[in-house]
Design a protein with these regions (language model features):
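His/Asp/Glu-rich mid-to-C-terminal helical/loop segments that flank catalytic regions of hydrolases
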Residues: 165-196
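Active-site rim beta-loop-alpha module in soluble metabolic enzymes
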Residues: 71-136, 147, 151
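Short glycine-enriched loops at secondary-structure junctions
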Residues: 61-63, 114, 161-163
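Active-site-adjacent mobile loop/cap segments within catalytic or ligand-binding domains
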Residues: 122, 127-138, 142-177
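Conserved catalytic block of serine-dependent lipid acyl chemistry
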Residues: 41, 139-151, 183-185, 189-192
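Metabolite-binding pocket within alpha/beta catalytic cores that recognizes anionic/polar moieties
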Residues: 1-93, 98-101
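Active-site-proximal beta-strand elements of phosphoester/diester hydrolases
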Residues: 10-14, 112, 158
Length: 196
């Protein structure tokens, strides 16, 4: 805990995957009574125009590994939840402004979440078969969004691209994860400066 500019902040390293990230949201909401949740980190680029180091701001998030279609839900939709989790629009707008001011290549759109590290075109094609507009894939965002929605907290998920999920993702991930983390942290600091 501490202050960043005029904001009280609590930094948490959630760990990898949907369960760990959702648990972090519960702790932040219950123990620290935070007003909002901002999640940053890395992701694998799916959109061909994205390069390592580019940033994706999730306007919405979806699970790419949930299948309750046998019960009448859309593919990716968790029971009694929306298919897509919508980020706070004012947060999206503020991140868009910060990224433009910093001249960082970025996109705003859909991020897909699942408990698998996506490496290989066949896996990307399967995800894009359900969600053609997906920009990036990662392992926490939609769970954070669902948990934030459950505790009625505004949220945003922002990812720096650490790899291009199609080929040798595991190799590029190891090389560029530090760079992606630094990029995400710098953007977050600028975002907090812009908040009223």
């Amino acid at each position: 805990t501490g202050r960043l500019g005029k904001h009280d902040v609590v930094l948490v390293q959630s760990g990898v995957g949907k369960v760990m990230s959702a648990m972090s949201v519960a702790v932040l909401a219950d123990h620290f009574e935070v007003d909002a949740l901002i999640n940053t980190g890395s992701a694998g680029a799916v959109a061909p125009e994205l390069k390592i180091g580019d940033v994706v701001v999730a306007s919405r998030l979806v699970y790419h590994d949930v299948d309750l279609t046998a019960f009448g839900y859309d593919y990716g939709q968790m029971s009694m939840q929306p298919l897509y989790f919508e980020s706070d629009p004012s947060f999206v707008e503020t991140f868009e402004k910060v990224l433009a001011q910093a001249s960082i290549d970025s996109k705003i759109g859909l991020i897909a979440t699942g408990d698998s590290f996506i490496a290989g075109q066949d896996k990307i094609d399967a995800i894009k078969g359900h969600f053609p507009e997906v920009l990036a894939v990662e392992m926490e965002g939609a769970a954070i969004a669902q948990a934030a929605q459950s505790v009625k907290k505004p949220f945003i998920v922002v990812r720096a691209m650490s790899d291009t999920a199609a080929h040798d993702a595991n190799i590029t991930f190891d090389e560029f994860i530090i760079q992606a983390g630094k990029q995400s942290a710098a953007i977050l600091v600028e975002f907090l400066k812009e908040l009223a």
